[in-house]
């Protein structure tokens, strides 16, 4: 199996785990109040959707043989776009949807923690 295929499978698993965390957190917060659940889901999607866009961007550029030094610039551009998209989604959730801050920020942090810890668990072959 090629390295790119392995990294694609790991990325898909990571995105799936993040989506499951968003859904689970939204369901748990909706037990208190349905709007808390919506707020939690919007906080999780503020991390999940930019990650999906970044993965699509990375997969699209993975097929090409880039020029020397271009990989770093492409990665930096994609990461900057991801952070900017996350900030825009958080502002929309707080300003437009009037989301409750606590479930939004808790789910946001949860998905970020999953983003950091899940690759170590996924790659652990035991």
Swiss-Prot record:
Those parts of the protein on the Cytoplasmic side are 2-14, 59-70, 118-126
| Tagged with keyword Transcription regulation | no
Q: Which residues form a coiled coil?
A: none
Keywords of the record: Cell inner membrane, Cell membrane, CF(0), Hydrogen ion transport, Ion transport, Membrane, Transmembrane, Transmembrane helix, Transport
Membrane-topology annotation of the record = Multi-pass membrane protein
Q: Which residues cross the membrane?
A: 15-35, 38-58, 71-94, 101-117
Q: Where in the cell is it found?
A: Cell inner membrane
Q: Which protein family is named in the record?
A: Belongs to the bacterial AtpI family.
Taken from the UniProt entry, a GO cellular component term is: plasma membrane
What gene does the UniProt entry assign to this protein? atpI
Disulfide-linked positions: none
Record organism = Escherichia coli (strain K12)
The role this protein plays is: A possible function for this protein is to guide the assembly of the membrane sector of the ATPase enzyme complex.
Protein name in the entry:
ATP synthase protein I
**Per the UniProt entry, what is one GO biological process?**
proton transmembrane transport
Signal peptide start and end residues: none
